[in-house]
Every structure is written in structure tokens, then in C-alpha cells.
């Protein structure tokens, strides 16, 4: 078994089941731009894996509309962010990883503001497990570029061999490969049929404990 010192998690689709956000963007877009050409639900699926800036460019949301668009999508709709919940077992696994003496980190394409929003979904005990948080605000290039993992290595002083990155998307897998970090495919959060290159594949969060 490798000598890991830190387990780094992606956020959406790995810690929290936020697939509902696809529907939020779909409905919010229709509400904000009723006169634009219709876009099918499938068009919004890539938004699940992209940053806020990438989504605005992808959906052609002008900069001056961004704040209102996000408010409509994530706060005004009936199924708001309160619908986003941690995956079953993830809270217990995070706490157990810390008890075993490993550091726990975050590598997400969310902004600081958006990431800290998951405090509403995670308990204080779980949120306090994170000793290093990498978000879009601290890097030049987001996943699949390796920047966010390189940032975590820089902040912690840990070499790539001592990090294990857990994620649910091809962007996560490519980020890990580019950084030279072992990757665990969090299959519990996958929303499609695509197969990702990985060192390990885990069907449930609890399986992570057997990799440490």
C-alpha cells in the first residue's frame, strides 16, 4: 500500500450529490431568457463539471447578468440549494479518515464563496476536517489543469506520491494525471456511462478506507 498522507476530495459529485444543479441551471436559464432559442436539458449537463466562469461563457451569460442568473437558479427556484445533500456515508468517512491521522483536502472548481456554501450541507465537525482548500480563486487554470493539486502540495509541503485524489469526472482524472497524483474514481457520484482512467475505483465512500 502506498504511503499516503493526505486524501483530497473534489466537491460536487464526490462529497455532495449536486446533480440537481443541472436542473436548476436548466430551469433558471429558461426563466431568465424566455426569448432565447430553446436549449435541451442535455445541453446543461457539462455545466456540472465546469467552473462558474466556464458556465457563463458556455451559456452566453453576460457578466452583468451573472449575479441575477445565479440567484434565480440557486435561490429562487422551488428546489433550491437545500436539495443538495452529502452522499450517504461521506460524513462518516471524512471523520474516520481524520481519526486515522490523514490530512483531508479539497480541490474544487467552485469559488471560495460557493465552496463555503456547503457548510449548510455538512456538519461543523465534517467541515473542520479540511486542512487545505483549493478553489478557483487561488489558481490560474482550473481542472483538468493540475494547478489546484499543485497548490495543495505547495501549501502542505507534501509530494505528489503522498496525495490521493478522489473525484467523479474526467476533469478530475486528468487533473490528477497531470499532477502525478493517484486518482480514485468516485463512482457513487458519476452521472453518465463514461469510464475514467484511475488507480482505484470506489462504488461507495466507505471503500476509501481500504485504500489507506
Q: Would you name each region that the model predicts?
A:
Residues 14, 108-110:
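Conserved phosphate-coupling serine/threonine residues in phosphotransfer and NTP-handling enzymes
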Residues 38, 46, 67, 84, ...:
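Non-catalytic, surface-exposed connector residues within folded enzymatic/regulatory domains
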Residues 24, 30, 43, 61, ...:
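Flexible domain-boundary/linker segments
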Residues 1-7, 95, 111-112, 116-212:
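Asp-based, Mg2+/Mn2+-dependent phosphohydrolase catalytic module
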Residues 2-100:
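N-terminal helical cap/lid subdomain that shapes the substrate entry/recognition surface
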Residues 36, 62-63, 101, 125, ...:
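Secondary-structure boundary/capping positions in well-ordered alpha/beta enzyme cores
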Amino acid at each position: 500500500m502506498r504511503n499516503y498522507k493526505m486524501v483530497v476530495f473534489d466537491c460536487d459529485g464526490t462529497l455532495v450529490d449536486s446533480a440537481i444543479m443541472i436542473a436548476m441551471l436548466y430551469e433558471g436559464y429558461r426563466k431568465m431568457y424566455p426569448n432565447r432559442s430553446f436549449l435541451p436539458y442535455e445541453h446543461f449537463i457539462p455545466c456540472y463539471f465546469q467552473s462558474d466562469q466556464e458556465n457563463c461563457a458556455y451559456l452566453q451569460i453576460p457578466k452583468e447578468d451573472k449575479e441575477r442568473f445565479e440567484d434565480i437558479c440557486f435561490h429562487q427556484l422551488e428546489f433550491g440549494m437545500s436539495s443538495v445533500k452529502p452522499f450517504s456515508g461521506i460524513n462518516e468517512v471524512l471523520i474516520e479518515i481524520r481519526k486515522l491521522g490523514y490530512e483531508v483536502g479539497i480541490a474544487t472548481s467552485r469559488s471560495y464563496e460557493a465552496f463555503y456554501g456547503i457548510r449548510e450541507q455538512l456538519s461543523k465537525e465534517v467541515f473542520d476536517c479540511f486542512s487545505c482548500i483549493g478553489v478557483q480563486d487561488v489558481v490560474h487554470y482550473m481542472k483538468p489543469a493540475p494547478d489546484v493539486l499543485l497548490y495543495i502540495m505547495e501549501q502542505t509541503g507534501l509530494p505528489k506520491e503522498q496525495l490521493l485524489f478522489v473525484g467523479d469526472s474526467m476533469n478530475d482524472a486528468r487533473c490528477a494525471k497531470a499532477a502525478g497524483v493517484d486518482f480514485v474514481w468516485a463512482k457513487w457520484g458519476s452521472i453518465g456511462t463514461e469510464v475514467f482512467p484511475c488507480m482505484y475505483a470506489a462504488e461507495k465512500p466507505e471503500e476509501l478506507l481500504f485504500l489507506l
